[in-house]
Amino acid sequence: MSQVVVCALYKFVTLPHYESLRAPLLAVMEASDIRGTLLLAQEGINGTVAGTQAAIDGLLAWFDTQEGLDNIVSKVSFDAQMPFYRTKVKLKKEIVTMGVEGIDPRKVVGTYVKPKDWNALISDPDVILVDTRNDYEVQIGTFKHAVNPVTETFREFPEYVKQNLDPAKHKKVAMFCTGGIRCEKSTAYLKEQGFDEVYHLEGGILKYLEEVKQEESLWEGECFVFDNRVSVNHNLEKGVYDQCNACRMPITEQDKLLPSFVQGVSCPHCIDKIPQEQRQRFIERERQVQLARQRGEAHIGSDVKQVIATRREKKDSLRKAQNEQS
């Protein structure tokens, strides 16, 4: 079985008629059996998709034919299995939500730093290194000596800056995120707040892991990704983490041994946070999942088309067997 190509992509560009792109983009993805989610907004495009190499190449070639979407920023990694269930194109107000009006990376942004130059920058004692990702992402891996803002969502990042960073004190600020898009907005925000020297890792962590040899790397741990792989290691292969189906937090095999872990229902991160009514829904959902597996059907959360196809095949086989007996 050939490897599935997983492609993270984004571009900040003014798309005044972004709504009209949804239908043709979805058609291109569905025609090539590309799965994943892409977000369209007036400020650009963002998302992660997966498919065959030919399918992803075709999608990127299609972008090059669309005004403003040529030379889109993309990073690829690989997986043995399709990491997404569905194909979606969503219309949004922002392609990455910071919640601060007027922040526009198309006008002002920090200085891009190539992966090959990143180690030298963050080894400078005058540089404060800030991880712009959420706390659950940071917990499974980050750069050596990076500051964790301990945010639950990217919306909390501006408040962290206000409370902890000072343009007069922090003369050089370097930031990084998974694929680079959050840093586009975070560096733009810092520039707006009066910070002078603001840097960010071009292409994000994924590009760094792709281009920097592990023996030279300052990355520690694994990188959280927003698909069914949960995390990738330094070789951009699926990591050791799983994901709680209740709260979506990354979990280890050790976590699964704890009494608080119930498959599809709870984990150590959410056992005390889930209301009883919601817990009962999770229990019923997991029961339906197990029943589907016993029937030989696809996961309840899988692509609906796949479930229908599986059921149709079983019906056809049963009908054929009945005809042979008659």
From Swiss-Prot:
An individual GO BP term: tRNA modification
Reactions listed under catalytic activity: uridine(34) in tRNA + AH2 + O2 = 5-hydroxyuridine(34) in tRNA + A + H2O
EC number of the protein: 1.14.-.-
Record's keyword annotation contains Glycosyltransferase: no
Annotated coiled-coil segments of the chain: none
Positions of the catalytic residues: 177 (cysteine persulfide intermediate)
Domain Rhodanese intervals: 123-217
One function term, GO molecular function aspect: oxidoreductase activity, acting on paired donors, with incorporation or reduction of molecular oxygen
Record key words, sorted: Oxidoreductase, tRNA processing
Matches recorded under InterPro entries: Rhodanese-like_dom, Rhodanese-like_dom_sf, TrhO, TRHO_N
Disulphides: none
One Pfam short name: UPF0176_N
Class in the EC hierarchy, top level: oxidoreductase
Chain's role: Catalyzes oxygen-dependent 5-hydroxyuridine (ho5U) modification at position 34 in tRNAs.
Family of the protein in this entry: Belongs to the TrhO family.
Protein name (record): tRNA uridine(34) hydroxylase
Organism from which the protein derives: Shewanella denitrificans (strain OS217 / ATCC BAA-1090 / DSM 15013)
